[in-house]
Every structure is written in C-alpha cells, then in structure tokens.
C-alpha cells in the first residue's frame, strides 16, 4: 500500500482522554488520510502468523504454555502481553458445519468508548488517521477504559497495573510501513491502506462470496461506534456473533456517555458559576468578614455598661 504511506506519516492528535467540549482536544492541522486494516475471514487459514508477528514486533510474550487446554485458541484470550488472538468457532449454518476463524484485537473505533471513559488526561489519544493509542506512562490503572470498550479489548497488566491493547503498529504506520500482522499474513487475508481503498476492496470480496452462495456476506464496519479502522469481510454479516461473539450492534455504554457528555460538563459549569459568584461577592461585599467581627467586638465593648451603672 505504498500509495497510502505518504498520507499516514504525520501523526496528528485529534482526541485526548479526559477532555470535553469545555476543554477541547487539539485538532489536526489539516486533513489526514483515514487508514484501515481489512480482515477477510473467508481467506484466513488460522495459521497464527499474525499473532507471532505482533508478538515479535512489540516484544511481548504471553504465557501460552500455561493456557493450553486442548483447544486451537492459544493463548485462549487477549491479555496485556497478547494483543491479537485467533478465535476458532465451529458453527452449523444451512445444515452445514462451518469452521469460522477470526483475528481478534482492537477495532480502533472512530468514536472510541475507551477514550471517552478514561479519566486520565492524555492516557488515550486518537490520531487523525484513526489510530487509537494508549500512553502507558499516563495510565492510572483505573480500568474505566476496559468497561467503556464495547468489544472487550483492553487488558490490565497486573505487573504494573496499566492497561494495554493493539496499537495498530502506530510506530510502523507513522513511517509509512504496514502493521506487523499485515506483513506476516501468508494468504493476504489481512490488508492495509486508506479506509476508502479497503472498503472498495471489501465490496469486491463480498461480491465474490455472494456469487459462491453466501447470500448474507458483507462488510463489518459498525455505525454504533462511528465505524472502525479495523474491518471484517464476513460470510454471515447478518450474524456477526457467530464469529466468537463479535457484537452485532456495538455502542458506547449509556452510563459512559451520560457521565462524560452530560454530568461532567454540567459539573464544570456549576463549578465555574460558583467561582464567578465568589468573585462577585468579593467585588460587591469585600473580604471583610473578620474585620466585621472585630468591629462588632469594639462596638460591644464601647456600649457595655460600666460596673457603677450595673450597681444602680
């Protein structure tokens, strides 16, 4: 995808965690090409080369031997040292047994729930090209990003109490290279480029699948999170849950939206109003509370009857 490389070299931040409309994040200086990774599950063979490529490039090692329980999934789940995992499912569709394989990892949502939920300033950022990246040095280990993710992706590392996930190889993409998983895929099931290019290619793959009898083939790019920068071509796009629980209509939890978009701004306005009221009080009344007390004391002493008067 050499033609896309120039458009994704500059990493401009457009969103930062723990900001709101009252404290807006910086915006990209100009338009940057939105990138996307397209995973065609119909051509994936489950070889796990992408897992190895991710592990090698990011220098992370999950304790896979401890998790091997007689299944193909190994490691059996994402963790702080396994940012991509192959999911294997046997399903019966149209009286046929099908073997569905899906590469699982961060979806890099256009409207990321993790970023919206994060209370730590700068711990999660989103670039103009769509990549959502965690800044581990600013993570406070609260785990709110885990609760805010509709795909259940981020994982806490018990060793340093910080959260990690796939970065979409932002370090490679920023210098015009493709992600490590794309580089290592032997069948071309994982592709990378501008989102527009990937959607055009996905249309071709969907048309091919439909011509082969998969009537409900389609592109998985859920609108509930504004679309994603990791997309899937699925045989059964009408039933994404068949692919190891891929959510059909993922959305940011209402409690997160209510907290960040309603309650937090209202609280900020209330605090601002209180500050203005204090300033107004200072300007109109003045900071003479202690002086008033002292004045009343002097006035009391002056008006206090003498001992002779009391005796009378």
Swiss-Prot record:
Cofactor(s) in the UniProt record: [4Fe-4S] cluster
Taxonomic placement: Bacteria, Pseudomonadati, Pseudomonadota, Gammaproteobacteria, Pasteurellales
Protein name: Formate dehydrogenase iron-sulfur subunit
Keyword entries, A-Z: 4Fe-4S, Cell membrane, Electron transport, Iron, Iron-sulfur, Membrane, Metal-binding, Repeat, Transmembrane, Transport
Binding-site residues, [4Fe-4S] cluster 2: 54, 166, 169, 181
Compartments in which it is found: Cell membrane
Gene Ontology MF annotations: 4 iron, 4 sulfur cluster binding; metal ion binding
Binding site for [4Fe-4S] cluster 1: 44, 47, 50, 185
Cofactor binding, per record: Binds 4 [4Fe-4S] clusters per subunit.
